[in-house]
From Swiss-Prot:
Protein name, per record: Proline iminopeptidase
Function: Releases the N-terminal proline from various substrates including at least dipeptides Pro-Pro, Pro-Gln, Pro-Trp and Pro-Tyr. Also acts on amides (Pro-beta NA) and oligopeptides including Pro-Leu-GlyNH2, Pro-Leu-Gly, Pro-Phe-Gly-Lys, Pro-Pro-Ala-OBut and Pro-Pro-Gly-(Pro-Pro-Gly)(4). Higher activity toward small peptides (up to three residues), but very low activity for longer peptides. Has no activity against p-nitrophenyl acetate, poly_L-proline, Met-Pro or amino acyl amides other than Pro-betaNA (Pyr-betaNA, Phe-betaNA, Cys-betaNA, Met-betaNA, Leu-betaNA, Ala-betaNA and Z-Gly-Pro-betaNA).
Species of origin: Heyndrickxia coagulans
Assigned keywords, A-Z: Aminopeptidase, Cytoplasm, Hydrolase, Protease
Entry GO CC: cytoplasm; membrane
Gene3D superfamilies the record matches: alpha/beta hydrolase
Amino acid sequence: MYTEGFIDVTGGRVSFQKFDENGGGTPVIVLHGGPGSSCYSLLGLKALAKDRPVILYDQLGCGKSDRPMDTTLWRLDRFVEELAQIRQALNLDEVHILGHSWGTTLAAAYCLTKPSGVKSVIFSSPCLSAPLWEQDQKRNLKKLPLDVQETINRCEENGTTDSEEFAAAIEVFGKHFVNRLEKQPEWLEQKPSGYRNADIYNIMWGPSEFTVLGNLKNFDCTTQLKEITCPSLYTCGRFDEATPETTEYYSSLTPKSKFHVFEKSAHMPYIEEPEEYLAVIGDFLNSI
């Protein structure tokens, strides 16, 4: 059964989709990346619905959700509140949480409010420390051709991260550390226009992946990961922006955690190795 609709949250309405093939199992709710992206690239996770309901939603300001102009809404605590409001609206008394990239920042911040009924949390290509993420990207940058490094550094220094040469350099970075597929799935190429909201990304992260200037600049929950006591799974790609070393470090700080690396992937193993990704995630959820 497929359901879609809108949920009222602080600041506007968010669009959600629910996939449910047999009505059994504890639901899993998926938190997309960004900040300011949408759930469309994660739609392949609906395959998990053979065992449990799967809920995807576009965070406020993104995708099909409302796009309010109030920039004070683009704060981590407001997105945490939004997740709580969605759970309440959908009567998700018990739930698994799967966050990807920025979605793991949101998942961790939410779990640290000690909500009831969270059966497990999956940190997929996690960002749980903005300073660590920034350090890792500086190291990743050094693995690229020298001219690409120089372009990115020059554009950051000159404030020209909106230029065509910066975009071209970022594309090279992406082919190394974000999505390494030569040919993208056809459904991914048909992405909806305007699904991203660059304003949210700029306010919360900044104009560049490599230097955090937004309001997440000081986010670091590593010292609190010991407080996440439900079962957890940390995953990343071998060539991920969310490096295996840092991801394993987060896992080591979290009780009841498991760690898995997708050997052929960068930051999007759910697209780069979809069968393996679904198998690992599905097995973990079914073990709870």
